[in-house]
Amino acid sequence: MKNNLWFKLSGVALLGLVVLGLAVPRGQTETTVTSVTLAAVVQDQQCQGGDNVNVTLTATLNPPQQNVQFQWDFNNDGIFDTPLSPNPMVTHVYPDETNVTAVVKVVKGRRSATDSVTFSTLRCEN
């Protein structure tokens, strides 16, 4: 009987830890259950005739997540230039020899995270 009582008490203690682990502190509106790292990366740049560069940007999540959507702001003006999409990769045409900061936002449910990448575009020969 002692073993049964201990087992029941252990179950209650464990349940209490789970509830405490998920409780939202007063004044906060969001709980982070897992830590996720978002990274924006320039995957490729290619001159596209004249003074334009076709830039491929991608976002990665570590650890990988399902049911997320990505949105890109190509010039860091605070306005996202793409609709939400499950595809983390986009292409955009920039002028050559330009310093650029692009921002990616990842959304999962009501949670979101952002990251930016700053880079210089290639010099294209006319």
Where are these regions (language model features)?
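Extracellular/lumenal mature domains of secreted and surface-exposed proteins
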Residues: 8, 16-126
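Bacterial N-terminal signal peptides that target proteins for export
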Residues: 2-13
